[in-house]
């Protein structure tokens, strides 16, 4: 939850968002600021890197509206029309459904688009990216003394398995702790787990 608080204008179109202070980026890339937040949203819209760039643009950069920095930890969003979900979207770093997160502008400027995007992402979460193979796996390590809470286990591996049957076989064989499945696979999982 990156947003500490927010206020909305009486007509529900101008939102003032205050970010938590002292939220560090991974790998020593400074503290999260309103500048990083706006840069991340603008970059996702410009590059089309979010899952829903059109929705992101309509939500944060509508014609006649947009985002502005008030101070290092405060920014405003003029949505032109009421946007009831805006506090939730900001508080969760937009990753919940729009598929974009807040990244360090400093890291992006130093390392370039490819590395800063997904090769070695630098964020603020309880897991720090340590290795990524395109189309394969992500390896994360727990961030000690994370500003919210240190995770209960030291490493997290995210494996991209696009084929449902392969994902299901790995899960049933105990090679995956959790996975997403189509509804059609649930009966097979329930049947095999009852054995």
PLM regions: where:
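Gly/Pro-rich hinge or "lid" segments in bacterial periplasmic/extracellular proteins
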Residues: 91-151, 155, 165
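Aromatic- and charge-enriched surface segment that lines or borders ligand/interaction sites
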Residues: 2-51, 76-78, 158, 167-172
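Extracytoplasmic
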Residues: 1-3, 10-14, 62, 70-74, ...
């Amino acid at each position: 939850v990156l947003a500490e608080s927010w206020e909305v204008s009486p007509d529900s179109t101008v939102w003032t968002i205050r970010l938590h202070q002292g939220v560090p980026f991974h790998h020593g890339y400074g503290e999260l600021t309103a500048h990083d937040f706006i840069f991340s949203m603008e970059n996702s819209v410009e590059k089309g890197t979010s899952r829903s760039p059109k929705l992101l643009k309509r939500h944060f950069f509508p014609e006649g509206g947009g985002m502005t920095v008030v101070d290092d930890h405060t920014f405003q969003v003029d949505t032109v029309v009421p946007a009831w979900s805006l506090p939730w979207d900001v508080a969760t770093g937009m990753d919940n459904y729009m598929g974009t997160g807040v990244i360090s502008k400093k890291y992006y400027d130093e390392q370039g688009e490819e590395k800063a995007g997904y090769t070695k992402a630098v964020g603020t979460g309880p897991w720090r990216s340590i290795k990524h193979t395109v189309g394969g796996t992500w390896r994360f390590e727990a961030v000690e003394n994370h500003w919210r809470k240190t995770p209960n286990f030291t490493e997290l591996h995210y494996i991209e398995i696009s084929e449902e049957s392969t994902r299901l076989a790995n899960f049933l064989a105990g090679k995956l702790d959790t996975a997403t499945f189509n509804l059609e696979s649930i009966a097979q999982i329930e049947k095999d787990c009852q054995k």
